[in-house]
Amino acid sequence: METRTAENTAIFMCKCCNLFSPNQSELVTHVSEKHGEEGVNVDDVIIPLRPLNTPENPNPSKGGDEFLVMKRKRGRPKGSTKKPSTEEEVVENLVSPSEDGPLATEEGSRLAPSSLECSKCCRKFSNTRQLRKHICIIVLNLGEEDGDAGNESDLDLEKTYKEDDREKASKRPRAQKTEKVQKISGKEAGQLSGAKKPIISVVLTAHEAIPGATKIIPVEAGPPETGAPPPETTAADLVPRRGYQEYAIQQTPYEQPMKSSRLGPTQLKIFTCEYCNKVFKFKHSLQAHLRIHTNEKPYKCSQCSYASAIKANLNVHLRKHTGEKFACDYCSFTCLSKGHLKVHIERVHKKIKQHCRFCKKKYSDVKNLIKHIRDMHDPQDKKVKEALDELRLMTREGKRQLLYDCHICERKFKNELDRDRHMLVHGDKWPFACELCGHGATKYQALELHVRKHPFVYVCALCLKKFVSSIRLRSHIREVHGAAQETLVFTSSINQSFCLLEPGGDIQQEALGDQLQLAAEEFVCPEIDVRKEEACPGEAQPEVGLRELVVPGDAHAPPPGPLATPQSESSSLSPCKLETTVVSSDLNSLGVVSDDFLLKSDTSSAEPPAAAEATSDTQHRDSAQTQGEEVTLLLAKAKSAGPDPESSPGGRQKVGALPASESDSSTCLRANPTEASDLLPTVTDGGDLGVCQPDSCTPSSEHHPGSTAFMKVLDSLQKKQMNTSLCERIRKVYGDLECEYCGKLFWYQVHFDMHVRTHTREHLYYCSQCHYSSITKNCLKRHVIQKHSNILLKCPTDGCDYSTPDKYKLQAHLKVHTELDKRSYSCPVCEKSFSEDRLIKSHIKTNHPEVSMNTISEVLGRRVQLKGLIGKRAMKCPYCDFYFMKNGSDLQRHIWAHEGVKPFKCSLCEYATRSKSNLKAHMNRHSTEKTHLCDMCGKKFKSKGTLKSHKLLHTSDGKQFKCTVCDYTAAQKPQLLRHMEQHASFKPFRCAHCHYSCNISGSLKRHYNRKHPNEEYTNVGSGELAAEALIQQGGLKCPVCSFVYGTKWEFNRHLKNKHGLKVVEIDGDPKWEPAAETPEEPSTQYLYITEAEDVQGTQAAVAALQDLRYTSESGDRLDPTAVNILQQIIELGSETHDAAAVASVVAMAPGTVTVVKQVTDEEPSSNHTVMIQETLQQASVELAEQHHLVVSSDDVEGIETVTVYTQGGEASEFIVYVQEAVQPVEEQVGEQPAPEL
């Protein structure tokens, strides 16, 4: 409507919608039609606006338009080509030139603050130019093409804001534009932003313009009810508002398991803002967006009062103080933001324009092109609509609402790159695969992080196939190399395996002693790589990545870096051992060298070594050609000095290789060829071990990029050579329960079972309120608290309203309020700064894994340690060699046993114990109350454990322990042992108050405690008889030691537990054989042969052991024939000596000593013991592999003379320890060495 003609008349305005009219009756009709339901008074809504006197024009020659233009204080933005428009300035002042100045100034100042606020996201701006370029204003109605007629005013409003800059003011009446601006500038703007409809759901629809894409469409609630708000609204406002809604899109599960053990995510989460209903795919971008609504600006400048909600904006601002700017390469343009420089180059120099498909217009910005198409072309047209959909994808608003679909499994992804990587999963081969566990990755970085999780790499000594655990290695040897000796092959494989050590990992020197140090000195793992020559000599093959061999003691070697072995640690190695000829002879002796690797050394030697290599190359060229393939072994020069070693003819060494099918397997070679040849002694002799044939054992990987990537990752990792002693030491520290799937070690079975379920995906705990399931009970408990409870943990800081159901999130939030964690942490490698310690730790572990933990500790100012890959490390007892879990109660009780402390004491008697549970069980003896009732038979018990054991009797498979004499079965082993007392023919222990008798003193004491608690313990039986008397009454004497047992089952149990033997009757004659190896028993078995009653028989046994070449690997493989030979030898000298003198001959592994104390039949055998397996760590000499030690005694009364028989060594150089055996106590204490003889 036109208002210029009413110079002296009043103009009426509707306060509800800011509608102007010179006729009051028209506004009355308007209010009754539009605002009648609101119950407003017409006189209060319609107000008259009367013009004031216009001040004198200082320049009468110029009109009011020019006067308003001259008042503009802000000029053109830097770099802008737009000219000032008088119409825009009139819009900014919100008045017409015909109106009086004072009224215009007052009205403009009153409406200006609200006019600079976005009606969609409520963000405020300092000027109209920023508001017009705001993303919400530009794309406000991009998704409202099909809107109803009630939104026409809003559509016109947006068109006003998105009006093209080139259109002049004369095209549209000035008053009409003023009216439209006021529609969002006045009071209703706040109403629109405050009455935003909440989102109740999210709908996914297929995108019309892009195949394979899905658009996220939020569904808003219905229109709010007009009328007074309910009284509950005030109470609801008091609840802390989270500010966003979270939606989970269920992912389609895989129809068949993937090659990887991982399962894809079952849900895809998206988020919506509760204030402006915007959709976000990532939570971090939503959190940054929410700061706009909360006016939170945590990033503050330390030099001025500037603050920002986004950290990147603060970084740009700081360049104002530092003077750092980005300069254009084509002109003198400079700016503070790298993004602004990119836009400048595209617009000014590259002349990149966005062309309209329907006319000849072109724009420098996609947003302006979208605005042009909507204003000048019909959005309802099909082609126009498709063009708009494509252009929206070039904006942040359009990309934010787009998901990408997999057309095979219909899974959805937040970005196109993840979808493309996922498509590789449906192929035949993973692009990046792990050869140890079969894990597949679609990124090289993901494979690199995955391989670092494997603590060990076990290599088969025959076929060089790699395994993630020793369990799979044993299974492989048993299934594929069944004809070979399993123990010998397994030991050789352990010696060729290695452990992957991350810098700062959890294999520490204080835990493993000097084992790693010795392994590093005796072995240098060569960094090897592949170079296979094709039939075409002119075609070059790409390098896979050369591995570096650190040569200690070399004068030309570079200083040791983070991954290099220190020169001082391995100075005993001679550099001549690493010559090419030595390596080639080493490889030929083994016969199992793969052609996949190159041997590279960081040496900068001159031409003489190269000439020697050339000579060696000439000598071995013919032998290499007979193998059908050539393998290049290269001692390369340093990267920074010397010519390319590949181009040097003297830098090549050809040796024999394996077939092509084994070319992708790796091995670690010893620097000493003699040690390497000893690993597989029967391979070169053509024995049973033989080289694995290609058809019988094919490596897991073929020649494809995944295998190459895995080898490159393996080459870049730090390694330590493994051996049997180091392996046993690691298992003693970290536990002997090994995970088959990843090689991790555990101490306790409950932890091991829980870990295995992470690989098998066996979920035992299910949520009763949703479909959630978890592996552990704690995860389920945390889920219930977070998702299904109204428990909120509030921040205790004054003035902070933060609350969360997760205690871990609250702990992370509390760091914001601490001054210590507000400091910035800088990466020592790339100098990138982080605000939290966890962020810099994750950054270093991901991007700079070579940084040691000491460096990270210095950066953070405290000692830190990454999560152990092997497992939880145990602590050694300060009094003995036993290991216990770190900070565990078992260690404390063990130390109390050494110190004789029993802190838990009974208040009713003198009983004391070191365990609280034992005290609780003891207190049940003073109580007659039985509170635990069996629901099957009604029997009552005092403790829960007793009830649990009793319930096993009601199950079919509960009685697993059977008597070997009668049909008795028991649910527990102690019950069976108690039953076996009934079958004893001789019972030397008898009660003085009843007819009870038994053959064990402990059973009689238990009888007194239960049946005669007030009587003193007294044995009225004959007590323990001498060995001869017990034998006369049917007892059995141990053939190894002097113990005699009254029953056969006690005798068999003694042989199995103490000596590892079992009785096997062959044709009626009893024979002693080594007991079958069980998982609980150690891998090294000690075989006790027979009795020897004089020195002569002992010497004969030693000679027999020398002929049999007894070693630790073959000790448990001796057949009964060899045992019988030794028995016959010992019996040769037994006729001329006293039969009362009893000694033992034992065959032991290298490095052990056995001390046997001679006793007579009159002495009670329970007062002494046989000490075995005392490791000679204090010896001044090192034992070779074939050393054997047999120790016996010549004195009858006591040990005064010790005879030591050795093979290849001086007996005087060994230290022998003797210790008296003690009676068993409640807590077994580790044996302490006695003074040396």
From Swiss-Prot:
GO CC entries: cytosol; nucleus
Upper taxonomic lineage: Eukaryota, Metazoa, Chordata, Craniata, Vertebrata
Binding site for Zn(2+) 10: 877, 880, 894, 898
Gene3D superfamilies: Classic Zinc Finger
Keyword Repeat: yes
Binding site for Zn(2+) 2: 301, 304, 317, 321
UniProt-annotated binding residues for Zn(2+) 7: 767, 770, 783, 788
Residues bound to Zn(2+) 11: 906, 909, 922, 926
Polar residues: compositionally biased ranges: 565-574
Alphabetic keyword roster: Cytoplasm, DNA-binding, Metal-binding, Nucleus, Repeat, Transcription, Transcription regulation, Zinc, Zinc-finger
ZnF bounds (C2H2-type): 12-35, 116-141, 271-293, 299-321, 326-349, 354-377, 404-426, 432-454, 458-481, 737-759, 765-788, 793-817, 825-848, 875-898, 904-926, 932-954, 961-983, 989-1012, 1036-1059
Binding site for Zn(2+) 9: 827, 830, 843, 848
Main location, first listed in the record: nucleus
Keyword Metal-binding: yes
Positions of Zn(2+) 12 binding: 934, 937, 950, 953
Gene Ontology biological process terms from the UniProt entry: hematopoietic progenitor cell differentiation; hemopoiesis; spongiotrophoblast layer development
Tissue expression: Detected in spleen and thymus but not in liver, muscle, heart, kidney, brain, bone marrow or pancreas. Expressed in CD19+, CD4+ and CD8+ lymphocytes but not in CD11b+ lymphocytes or peritoneal macrophages (at protein level).
Annotated protein name in UniProt: Zinc finger protein ZFAT
Originating organism: Mus musculus
A molecular function (GO) term: DNA-binding transcription activator activity, RNA polymerase II-specific
